[in-house]
Amino acid sequence: MNNELYLSFKITNWCNLHCDHCCERSNKHNEPKFLSLEKLDKYLSESKTLPIIPNQLISFSGGETFAPYMFNQPNYIPVALDLAYSYGYIPTIKTNGTWGDNDLLRIKILNDIASRAHKYGKLVTLDISVDEFHNNESGVMKIISNTLTNFDLCYAIRICLVGFNTPGSANALNSSQQKLQTLGFEIDKTYSGDWMICAPNQSCGIYMCNDYATPIYNIGRAKQTKTYTSTGNPNGNDGANCLQLDNNDYAILNYTYREPIKNRPLNKVLESLMEKVH
């Protein structure tokens, strides 16, 4: 195990979608149980004592990560971002982006996360799934258009459109690219599979990227006995390690090795997981 570690917090299994390929067993029939903010605070605090110092880039995922807004908990994500920033981390929020079609919800979410980014002087990133599995192009276009045409949002939010290494994902990304061009956004194709989309004369932008360097394996919903359906490397560079802490009091290393936390210190949990690797 090398010395690069990324932290990820899975805040819920609830999702408004039920995608056939979902590796997290997420759907709208799951109980909307959220990782408590008290536990998030505890994990972030203890992360500073881990034997491997985590990268400052962390992620929040689900289910649908913005689900708290749909269950009358509009302060959840802003407080989670406050905690992440206060411990010196830079957050990425993974989402399916379908909330972009709800005008009131879209404006609320974008303003909330932008206000936190401005407060701490660091960007917040949205990772939005754009592939053959998510019918979300309309909502995604509205999120992008709002972000890049609003000064406060443009300088606070970075958006990554994330796809798989499949022809369907390539088609979805190309379709998004063409629609963005019709909206008047400049696109600089810097290297194969990745585009950076910038509002004219603005320094902030959007990255369209293929998130996985390898093809998808074992497409299909995860089995109850299998934590994760592998889709390639974990977050970060090749060989990096990802420690995910979820809403069911489990720690998962590299989407493979699973360990109950059971009120143990996080450094002890990571030690147990590292023993499983070896």
Model-derived regions: residue spans:
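Solvent-exposed loop and beta-edge segments used for protein-protein assembly and interaction
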Residues: 1, 85, 120, 153, ...
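N-terminal pre-triad scaffold of radical SAM enzymes
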Residues: 1-21, 55-60, 241-249
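Conserved glycine-rich "GG(E/T)P / GGGxP" loop and the immediately following alpha-helix
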Residues: 6-12, 24-174
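Generic detector of well-ordered alpha-helical segments enriched in charged/polar residues
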Residues: 111, 174-177, 181, 267-275
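Eukaryotic C-terminal
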Residues: 158-160, 172-202
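Accessory C-terminal segments flanking Radical SAM cores
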Residues: 190-278
